[in-house]
Amino acid sequence: MITGIQITKANDQALVNSFWLLDDEKAEARCVCANGQYAEDQVVAVSDLGQIEYREVPLEMQPTVRVEGGQHLNVNVLRRETLEDAVKHPEKYPQLTIRVSGYAVRFNSLTPEQQRDVIARTFTESL
């Protein structure tokens, strides 16, 4: 179990008012902040701190989210009619951006053939 502490009394005065995370299972202490000889995130054996008195400091633990493997979802939020109108009236859609092969591109910068291909591949009647 991890316990947060603030050292209130110690043989080594540099430790007074420093903050640590104590790991009871490993008998280690991780420095959160201290003056002097200990660096932030430095890990030492609890016995290296010597004789100390401390007060516990409440900890707020946030669960770690782990994603392995990953998923990808490509969501199209356009209608076929919007892209067809952009082919006919490009001046109405100067900022229309689409994704092609993993990168973003302005629809109007594509050739007419590429635009037709995007429309054909993006909107199908059935799978």
UniProtKB/Swiss-Prot annotation:
It comes from the Bacteria. Residues 5-127 form the Glycine radical domain. InterPro entries: Auton_GlycylRad_Cofactor, Form_AcTrfase_GR_CS, Gly_radical, Glycyl_radical_cofactor_GrcA. The modification Glycine radical is found at G102. Gene3D superfamilies: 3.20.70.20. Transmembrane segments: none annotated. One of its GO terms (cellular component) is cytosol. Keywords: Organic radical. GO terms for molecular function: formate C-acetyltransferase activity. HAMAP family: GrcA (MF_00806). Acts as a radical domain for damaged PFL and possibly other radical proteins. NCBIfam families: spare_glycyl. This is Autonomous glycyl radical cofactor. The lineage of its organism: Bacteria, Pseudomonadati, Pseudomonadota, Gammaproteobacteria, Enterobacterales. The gene is grcA.
